[in-house]
Amino acid sequence: MNKIIQLGIIILSVMLVSCSASRTAERYTQQWRYEIEPVSIGTKGSYLIKVWSYSRNQAVAAEQAKKNAVHGVVFRGFTGMNGVSAKPPLATSPNLENEKKEFFDPFFANGGRYMKYVSITNDGSIGAKDRLRVGKEYKIGLIVSVAVDELRKDLEDAGMIRPLGAGFAPR
């Protein structure tokens, strides 16, 4: 009987710790602390970018990099470097995320629809130069591919962004 109680306490402790880690990851995501830099030209319809994410836990930072990459393409864009031209954000309204919160909260939730548009290109391994200690946190750099054409089409279909040709009247 005593062993059953001990086992129950251990299982409960593990569950509480895993829930806490998930809440921590969500809190870091809501702050949207990341940097994006272009790496090279991806295949047609995609961006190949390096995303720098911040977290106290390296595994959390690596997982959040995918979410941050899609968020950056939609809301921030990136400056040009390494022979890659600058890309503006897909969203033209700076307040779109707050205006359409009911759409974007589930979109960026853990395991949300953002996963459809992003993939890590280097099997998820983090190089020594891409793992930096900044105070009590890690700054983790991962190279990801974002399927921009698919993302744009789905956001247009959902009415979140205007189609590319929407500003021009037909003749």
Language-model regions: role of each:
Residues G8-M15:
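Bacterial N-terminal signal peptides
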